[in-house]
Amino acid sequence: MKQYNPKEIESKWQNIWEERGVFHASNDKDKEKFYALIEFPYPSGQGLHVGHPRPYTALDVVSRKRRLEGYNVLYPMGWDAFGLPTENYAIKNKIHPKVVTEQNVARFKKQLQGLGMSFDWSREINTTDPEYYKWTQWIFLKLFEKGLAYKKEMSINWCTSCKVGLANEEVVNGGCERCGAEVVRKQKNQWMLKITEYAERLINDLDLVDYIERVKIQQKNWIGKSEGMEVDFEITGGKKITVYTTRPDTLFGSTYMVISPEHPYIEELAAHIQNMDDLVHYREEAAKKSEFERTELVKDKTGVKIEGIEATNPATGKQIPIFISDYVMMSYGTGAIMAVPGHDTRDWEFAKKFNLPIVEVVSGGNVDEAAYTDTEEGIIVNSDFINGMQVKEAKEKISSWLEEKGLGKRKVNYKLRDWVFSRQRYWGEPIPLVHCDCCGWVPVPESQLPVLLPEVESYEPTDNGESPLANLRDWVETTCPKCGGKAERETDTMPQWAGSSWYFLRYTDPHNNEELASKENLDYWMPIDWYNGGMEHTTLHLLYSRFWHKFLYDCGVVPSCEPYQKRTSHGMILGENNEKMSKSRGNVINPDDIVTEFGADTLRLYEMFIGDFEKSVPWSQNGVKGCRRFLDRIWKLQEILVDSQEMTKELEGNIHKTIKKVTEDYETLKFNTAVASMMALINDFYDHGTVTKGDMKTLLTLLNPVAPHITEELWEVLGFEGHIYGTTWPIWDEAKTIDSVVEIPIQINGKVKGQMVISVDFTADQVKEQFRNDERLMALVEGKSIVKEIYVPGKIYNIVVK
């Protein structure tokens, strides 16, 4: 028997699979399809780390199993290669982003191929390929044509390091999601996408899909639907300020108003305002703060009272003061709030600081001491005609009253904001629009797509916030497609999220030059049957791609309103000390090192055996070694092989149980228990002393999705017909998974004293008879009289003695 040599057999089988196109999906519409998808990676300079193979292997296991079950499986791979990380790396190391991308993709691909993933490499895509981003640009033009892409002067999140505008979703704890640098507010003309137009459908259609519950909850919370009232407050100067509130029942408790420092009424009412200089100074200070700093709950409350104008509370008719404060943002609601300090902590703290009245309107607390916020239920007080009502009844009553008086209207609001789509950087898809003084913004004709990203020597971001492309006058200056006059190209580029918002569609028809993908292929392959990805992308990529897909559905391009039928997520792999892997901690594990020392099958097996797939788990080098020993034991089963195509009779029940367990566990992401059941079966084979060819074929087929190289090699070495990739998945016999005997505990006066093996069919009388016929067991009650006996079928035999 040859020694197990992973290096030799793994490269051999990887070459065979690729040369024969074993994992190439066909467009044979007569076969039932299975489209498995993992998030395509950003190819970083560091290459793969051991966290990458975990989700890749998981869906590889499912894909390999589904192929053996007869499905036409599409399991593709590509590269999300545009974006800030590549550009920042290129600037730092003085290498062009295009060169960086090519080098990184080549390294990533080599690493992935070395892991034996069953990707269909014939469908490989790259978001930086002009033949790919041609269709990203095409989708943008469709959004523009439908009025869902618009340019607007607005206050945006600005990363001080990347020098680029960020969407709200890209700001984490006041810092840039990519680099961690401070994020400030800056006025900028930006392209926006109206994702808010799809807010309701993005919530409702979650009922149509099989996502893990916490993903659905995160998406709903991010969209932030609320139902309330828009209420008009008359103010000095004959104007009205409209506020949005979900608690109109607390209107009688509104003792002051707060508006955003950027509110346009400040300029419009300047003639009435007596302390304009104070307001302008406060606004300048607020502009220096990020949105995170401004809205942080624990920060000190600051503000300035607007002298010279007041508002009228429409419920009480009383005059109330108006303040500006940085915790109110123009980008949320109407840029104004009615403050109810009795029942809102932030309003209460503000009222205390500025010595403003605090009125209790929902009974239950002591508003002199703190805001009473447990007000979802309760009795209304100090509120005139809604006094004594429950909160729910009071909401309805005052809402109707406001509508009747023309003082307000019911409104559904969303926390979700439109998507900031411009990036003032080089390494991204050019936005296919030109600006003409006569015609405004004009789309580049589809026949001229793609608008190629020009080759440049200097791609550093500019200090004035313009894209590096703005300096390329030969490229910028062009002709208006509409009137033939002078025009200039848009110099902002798209965000990294653009290419990843539709990539899964291109996999269905990656070489199509005439359309995004053929209707025939989209109708066959979509929607995706199973998509696995990180929880960190729930409010970014997952939301954006669902939005684009719904838009394309409305355009008649795709056949389904949702792109992903099922979405699962995986836990991180941590360092051995339970800390997140990072270069600074020196605990990063390179998968190449594991493959070199132990083999790809060992790495794959370990990552599936390491623990609950959905939870984060620490790396263990000893665990890796244990998995290698397990594969060695499988290899050595050759030594006890006997020439029989039947299953070992004595182990037949265990084999059928293992088939059932592995089949079900692979589909429910319980890879660790599936592997454990195969380990137990191998122990049975060694304990028995022989393994038949029938046993071996079953074991190798079950293990193949996890450890494909060693199983294919053993299949060939043992002279079995064909290859595992051409065989069929084993089917268990349910009758053979049921034990004919069971071991039950014997409990005497409440304490377990022994065990007995009985037939599963035994009645209580038969159990009693077997107990009395066993001298060893009868010794447990010797000298005592049996008072009572209770048999719980298949579970326990209780005896009471005295």
Swiss-Prot record:
Motif stretch ('HIGH' region): 41-52
Homology family: Belongs to the class-I aminoacyl-tRNA synthetase family.
GO terms of molecular function: aminoacyl-tRNA deacylase activity; ATP binding; leucine-tRNA ligase activity
Sequence motif 'KMSKS' region, residues: 580-584
Binding site for ATP: 583
GO biological process assignments: leucyl-tRNA aminoacylation
A matching Pfam family: tRNA-synt_1_2
Catalytic activity: tRNA(Leu) + L-leucine + ATP = L-leucyl-tRNA(Leu) + AMP + diphosphate
Keyword Manganese: no
Subcellular location: Cytoplasm
Keywords for the protein's UniProt record, in alphabetical order: Aminoacyl-tRNA synthetase, ATP-binding, Cytoplasm, Ligase, Nucleotide-binding, Protein biosynthesis
InterPro entries: aa-tRNA-synth_I_CS, aa-tRNA-synth_Ia, Leu-tRNA-ligase, Leu_tRNA-synth_edit, M/V/L/I-tRNA-synth_anticd-bd, Methionyl/Leucyl_tRNA_Synth, Rossmann-like_a/b/a_fold, tRNAsynth_Ia_anticodon-bd
Source organism: Alkaliphilus oremlandii (strain OhILAs)
Assigned EC number: 6.1.1.4
GO annotation, cellular component aspect: cytosol
Record-linked CDD domains: Anticodon_Ia_Leu_BEm (cd07958), LeuRS_core (cd00812)
SUPFAM superfamilies in UniProt: Anticodon-binding domain of a subclass of class I aminoacyl-tRNA synthetases, Nucleotidylyl transferase, ValRS/IleRS/LeuRS editing domain
The protein, known as: Leucine--tRNA ligase
